[in-house]
From Swiss-Prot:
UniProt miscellaneous comment: Ghost bat has two hemoglobin components in the ratio 3:2. They share identical beta-chains and differ by three replacements in the alpha chains.
PTM-bearing positions, type Phosphoserine: 3, 35, 49, 102, 124, 131, 138
Protein name (database record): Hemoglobin subunit alpha-1/2
Keywords from the UniProt entry: Acetylation, Heme, Iron, Metal-binding, Oxygen transport, Phosphoprotein, Transport
The keyword Phosphoprotein is assigned to this record: yes
Length: 141
């Protein structure tokens, strides 16, 4: 559960991300594919090379979804319901992959916003991404 301080940290961090959410999403996907090659199996139809238009487009979807979630911290299940359905019923993504992508997102955010990435912000963003992952995997049961 996100505390009021966590919510404030997430909102402040996401305000700094701003219009770069899609770029950060694409960078995090690239990090994930390089660090955890088994994740590539969900994207057999993608050109996974650096700077690929397909990775950038999917990164934008990731960034947009996280921006939506950051704007609805009090109702993540409602904000992410359609995405939860998509990943559980159609794409059938292994839930562990959300944790891997979350880790890569944290690394990406830390690399771009080192000064603002305090231990408290890190903890809040980690809790936020874990909450998003929990919602996205909630319909797997």
């Amino acid at each position: 559960v996100l505390s009021p301080a966590d919510k404030a940290n997430v909102k402040a961090a996401w305000d700094k991300v701003g219009g770069q959410a899609g770029d950060y999403g694409a960078e995090a996907l690239e990090r994930m594919f390089l660090s955890f090659p088994t994740t590539k199996t969900y994207f057999p139809h993608f050109d996974l090379s650096h700077g690929s238009a397909q990775v950038k487009a999917h990164g934008k979807k990731v960034g947009d979804a996280l921006s939506n979630a950051a704007g609805h911290l009090d109702d993540l299940p409602g904000a992410l319901s359609a995405l939860s359905d998509l990943h559980a019923y159609k794409l059938r993504v292994d839930p562990v992959n959300f944790k891997l992508l979350s880790h890569c997102l944290l690394v990406t955010l830390a690399s771009h916003h080192a000064a603002e990435f305090t231990p408290a912000v890190h903890a809040s963003l980690d809790k936020f991404l874990a909450s998003v992952g929990t919602v996205l995997t909630s319909k797997y049961r």
